[in-house]
Swiss-Prot record:
Cofactor(s) of this protein: Mg(2+)
Binding residues annotated for Mg(2+), in chain numbering: T81, T100, D123
A Pfam family it matches: Ras
GO biological process: exocrine system development; Golgi to plasma membrane protein transport; regulated exocytosis; regulation of exocytosis; regulation protein catabolic process at presynapse
Gene3D superfamilies: P-loop containing nucleotide triphosphate hydrolases
Motif range (Switch 1): 90-105
Protein name per the record: Ras-related protein Rab-26
């Protein structure tokens, strides 16, 4: 089979409504007003799923039916790279390592309900000096996984600023999920699970806690995203609608021992 690019889509089925914060009001940092609901327009954005579903061959030799771009965003040090390596390679980057410079990506093909779904996962730098670089990649993203570190209160407090940035640069119907990472660090936890749940509910986001070290909920997070994107690309309107929030609540594994 010859190599070919996946064609662009003209639209997906019933894109979900995302609730995002209003723009930052102060120059001293992002202080949000009441969140506002952003509803997608009648036409799908240019980053939509493929128009037709025909097997394609990726650069690694893996065949896939449909491909999507997923971005990992959040402060530096929240574990974006470790989460990606755990999902892609089933390994954990132990010890110290150099933070991501700019942006990097890896591919993985999943079997989702009989369809080969390729996720092109972009790992972004969280440092402020690289923001102008990552902004350019938001526009083409189909999904965003927004991470904070449960042992770092600042990374949690900055989630609202990240949501403001997403509102400005990403597509209106981008799939969003909030992840509280490093849940294995029980003794160092400073952000309660309930706080993450409350914030996610405020902005209408699916939420779960993850651990790149143990693998807790890592595969589930990416699988849930793949299922949602696959559903949007489906041609048959009669197909039962996949509900991302319900799937995450049903399949997610809690860590009650880590609650404060």
């Amino acid at each position: 089979m010859s190599r070919k690019k996946t064609p662009k889509s003209k639209g997906g089925s019933e894109p979900a409504t995302s609730t995002l914060p209003a723009a930052a009001a102060a120059t001293n940092g992002p202080r949000l007003a009441h969140p506002r609901t952003v509803r997608p327009g009648p036409e799908a954005p240019p980053n939509g799923p493929p128009q037709s579903i025909r097997p394609s061959l990726g650069s690694t030799g893996d065949f896939y039916d449909v491909a999507f771009k997923v971005m990992l965003v959040g402060d530096s040090g929240v574990g974006k790279t470790c989460l990606l390596v755990r999902f892609k390679d089933g390994a954990f980057l132990a010890g110290t390592f150099i933070s991501t410079v700019g942006i990097d990506f890896r591919n993985k093909v999943l079997d989702v309900d009989g369809m080969k779904v390729k996720l092109q996962i972009w790992d972004t730098a969280g440092q402020e000096r690289f923001r102008s670089v990552t902004h350019a990649y938001y526009r083409d993203a189909h999904a965003l996984l927004l991470l904070y570190d449960i042992t770092n209160k600042d990374s949690f407090d900055n989630i609202q600023a990240w949501l403001t940035e997403i509102q400005e640069y990403a597509q209106q119907d981008v799939v969003l999920m909030l992840l509280g990472n490093k849940v294995d660090s029980t003794q160092d936890r400073v952000v309660k699970r309930e706080d993450g749940e409350k914030l996610a509910k405020e902005y209408g986001l699916p939420f779960m806690e993850t651990s790149a070290r143990t693998g807790l909920n890592v595969d589930l997070a990416f699988t849930a995203i793949a299922k949602e994107l696959k559903q949007r690309s489906a041609k048959a309107p009669s197909e039962p609608r996949f509900r991302l929030h319900d799937y995450v609540k049903r399949e997610g594994r809690g860590v009650s021992c880590c609650r404060l």
